[in-house]
Regions:
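Short N-terminal secondary-structure initiator segments
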Residues: 1-11, 47-55
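Active-site beta-loop-alpha junctions enriched in small/polar residues
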Residues: 3-7, 28-32, 56-58, 105
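Distinct, well-ordered alpha-helical segments
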Residues: 4-20, 37-40
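Charged, low-complexity surface patches
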Residues: 32-33, 80
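Structured C-terminal cap/extension of enzyme domains
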Residues: 18-24, 38-139
């Protein structure tokens, strides 16, 4: 597999995917950084390449954007009870089957992150609503 956490390397990653058989790729993807949506994630889906996602919280940028806001009503539609679960469910709901690998040093955060794997995932319409919600907050 091949790993990158920089959008600047996406062109090189696409080139590697076109010329080599990979089992997986690992890249930066989140509700706040959707740059892999247009090319890399569809390419991975087409080629049957597993996708691991680093930085699913955007280095904390997503948490900073939502601050102390309450979860929107639509969070209940995907059985999310925390912002972390919302952000992880967004990543997991991509048709490529992306698997987020969030980092944490706190056991209660790890437990909350694992809860994102339970319940429903957003469909395409809710994914767009989530994007429309976060984009103005990120500026």
């Amino acid at each position: 597999g091949v790993t990158t956490s920089s959008d600047r390397q996406y062109e090189a990653l696409a080139d590697v995917m076109n010329h080599h058989t990979l089992d997986f790729i690992q890249l930066d993807y989140s509700l706040g950084n959707r740059n892999a949506n247009d090319r890399l994630l569809p390419m991975a889906l087409d080629k049957g390449v597993a996708v691991l996602v680093n930085l699913p919280f955007g280095r904390g940028r997503l948490f900073n954007a939502v601050g102390d806001r309450s979860l929107p009503d639509w969070a209940a539609d995907i059985d999310a009870t925390s912002w972390a679960q919302v952000f992880l469910k967004y990543v997991m709901s991509h048709p490529s089957g992306a698997i987020p690998i969030p980092g944490t040093t706190k056991p209660h955060h790890a437990e909350d992150n694992l809860s994102a794997a339970r319940g429903r995932l957003p469909d395409a319409n809710l994914r767009r609503e989530m994007e429309n919600f976060i984009d103005p907050l990120l500026g």
